[in-house]
């Protein structure tokens, strides 16, 4: 139940990777047959990704994952367009892979505007409209929030950015495989394999033709100079298989989340859903709930002892002390933040597992409240 942190690699992905390890040992930059064969195979993966998000094959570039893709978009565009302007716009609920580069860019002399969100996690569009101007070079807004599951209005925000001559980037690491990204209007899209039952250490960035971006990793000029370094062939083969299967379980996820939400609400009192219960603006994979009268971290470990794995927020920043910047941004109180748990579902979860999770969570919460330690 912690699939927003990472997902179990699928059997199908593992099988194609094992075959790839056995035969795909050429360097795709080599001019001989071994190199050409491998290059053709990874170009097939490129095409699979392009088809799934509405880009062309030549607009897909491989990276080591979502963090690198986000960094490349932010630093690469800032470097390429610094003469056009020095303003970047993002939101207060972005992943650290966007927020940390933005803070670095501020130190480098760029102005970064952080747009507020409402209690659902939707950016305040009036504030966004007022911030946009002809000096805005890039807007970076995630497709789906990794803590509360809110689907952000990236198509509308991309259109508004383009009206002012700005480029638009979306971190779609949590959205890929969950929402339709074709026609979303983004100039840059970041995706990651390990969030869709693929291998870790593999990702991609889509770069719309004509969008200014400079390489941040220099060397042999692989990926048409956008990202040097010999490609992770076997990982990319696994990525391609994961992309093929990415959207197969979307409806199953929605049904499981609905079952989990309804069960928790009917069985446990004094809970609060963080984000939105509206399925039209919330992904089917993430449910963030505050169980008032408990502490999320202690509840996490209690559930862990029962074989149920959840989280209290983003795994990428959970080792850092401090409250969730996402829950703070949507207006949660201190008690709501400290008692929050994120459940994140995968297509491999079953209705029976959802029911067990509800039962064990109910027992754990009741035990804490009976003790009265946190009231």
Predicted regions and their residues:
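Pyridoxal 5′-phosphate
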Residues: 1-375
């Amino acid at each position: 139940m912690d699939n927003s942190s990472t997902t179990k690699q699928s059997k199908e992905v593992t099988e194609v990777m094992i075959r790839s390890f056995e035969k795909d040992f050429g360097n795709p930059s080599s001019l001989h047959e071994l190199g050409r064969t491998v290059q053709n195979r990874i170009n097939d993966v490129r095409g699979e990704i392009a088809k799934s998000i509405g880009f062309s094959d030549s607009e897909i570039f491989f990276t080591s994952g979502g963090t690198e893709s986000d960094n490349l978009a932010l630093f690469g565009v800032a470097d390429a367009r610094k003469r056009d302007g020095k303003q970047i716009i993002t939101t207060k609920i972005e992943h650290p892979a966007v927020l940390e580069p933005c803070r670095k860019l501020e130190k480098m002399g760029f102005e970064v505007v952080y747009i507020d969100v409402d209690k659902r996690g939707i950016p305040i569009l009036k504030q966004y409209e007022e911030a946009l101007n002809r000096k805005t070079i890039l807007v970076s807004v995630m497709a789906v929030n990794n803590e509360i599951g809110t689907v952000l209005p990236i198509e509308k925000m991309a259109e508004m950015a383009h009206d002012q001559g700005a480029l638009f980037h979306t971190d779609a690491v949590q959205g890929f495989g969950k929402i339709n990204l074709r026609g979303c209007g983004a100039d840059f899209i970041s995706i990651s394999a390990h969030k869709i039952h693929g291998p870790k250490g593999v990702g991609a960035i889509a770069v719309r033709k004509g969008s200014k971006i400079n390489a941040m990793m220099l060397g042999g000029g692989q990926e048409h100079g956008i990202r040097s370094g010999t490609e992770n062939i076997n990982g990319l083969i696994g990525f391609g298989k994961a992309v093929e299967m990415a959207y197969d379980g979307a409806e199953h996820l929605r049904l499981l989340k609905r079952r989990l939400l309804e069960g928790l609400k009917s069985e446990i009192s004094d809970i609060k859903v963080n984000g939105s219960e509206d399925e039209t603006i919330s992904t089917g994979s993430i449910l963030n709930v505050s169980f008032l009268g408990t502490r999320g971290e202690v509840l996490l470990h209690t559930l862990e002892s029962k074989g149920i794995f959840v989280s209290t927020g983003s795994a990428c920043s959970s080792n850092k002390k401090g409250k969730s910047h996402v829950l703070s941004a949507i207006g949660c109180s201190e008690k709501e933040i400290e008692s929050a748990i994120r459940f994140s579902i995968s297509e491999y979860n079953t209705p029976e597992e959802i029911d067990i999770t509800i039962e064990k969570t109910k027992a754990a919460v009741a035990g804490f409240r009976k003790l009265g330690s946190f009231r």
